[in-house]
Amino acid sequence: MKVTSVADPILPLCQRLLPVRIAGLSLALLKATVLELAILAGHVLLYPSGIIQERRGPACPLPAPGTTPLPAEAKPPVVLLHGFIDNRSVFVLLRRSLAQHGRHRVESLNYSPLTCDIRTAAELLGRHIEQICERTGSDRVDVVGHSLGGLIARYYVQRLGGDRRVRTLVTLGTPHAGTRVAPLANAHPIVRQMRPRSELIQELAQPAPGCRTYFVSFWSDLDHVMDPLESACIEHPDLKAENIRVSGIGHLALPLHPAVANSIRLVLDTVRPGDEAGAHTGGLTVA
């Protein structure tokens, strides 16, 4: 998957200020870095708007005695789960894109930035999804998780029986195999859980026979948070999984870029009867 013309308006200025050739720095990396910085600046402004948990809609009313209930909306609700030290504001553009294309039941879950355990956060997600199903009358949901949010959702699906509720899990830049980036951050317990060969990562590698959820992982070839880059891929013999490589953007752009949002919508709208377990690969070029 390739995103085209991501930061073209800014590039001429960069090319004037920087040497013509910068050793070891490709044009694609330069464009992705400029975009990441622009997104970071914008997200700092939006961050306060997402601190408070969003208001929930009313519960689905029970049908009157002797009446036939109306059929539930064909498309299941979508749950958005942010990454480490972030909040629901990161999904403002994705949420708008989903709503514009018929996904009106979209909810975000804020978990505390002080969360120190992925398992605890996964239990919170499970309770949240049960509440959504009760309110909407839907049996299943789709989940989109960015970075740590994807790992929390995967733990819920794989280890807490969440495959009963989650139809499709889309992860964006999630360290499924752990990441070695920022070694000085090991003081935080949840960062240690995201390291390769951590107890939690090894737990996710255990057998998961009969898992009913379909997994789609978007991973970027310019993701500065994934070390190695392929750690954002799902490799598990028991899981029905697809890995989609995104070329040309970095970690922060994954939940915000229109081309990625379009691909997420296609993934969620695809019916997959009889999918077999095992990882599949694909690609999306965005720059």
Q: Language-model segments: which ranges?
A:
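Serine-dependent carboxylesterase/thioesterase catalytic core
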Residues: V78-S89, R95-R212, S217-W219, V225, ...
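Short alpha-helix in the alpha/beta-hydrolase fold that links the catalytic acid
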Residues: L94, D227-I234
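Catalytic histidine neighborhood in serine/cysteine hydrolases
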Residues: H104-E107, P237-L254, I264
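Acidic beta-to-alpha connecting loop that harbors the catalytic carboxylate
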Residues: D221-H224, G248-G250
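Flexible, membrane-associating and regulatory peripheral segments of lipid-active enzymes
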Residues: M1-V78, V92-L93, H101, T270, ...
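Post-His helix in hydrolase/transferase enzymes
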Residues: P255-D269
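Catalytic histidine-centered segment of alpha/beta-hydrolase-like enzymes
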Residues: D117-I118, I249-P258, L284
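Conserved serine/cysteine hydrolase catalytic core
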Residues: E54-G57, P69-A72, I201-S217, L268, ...
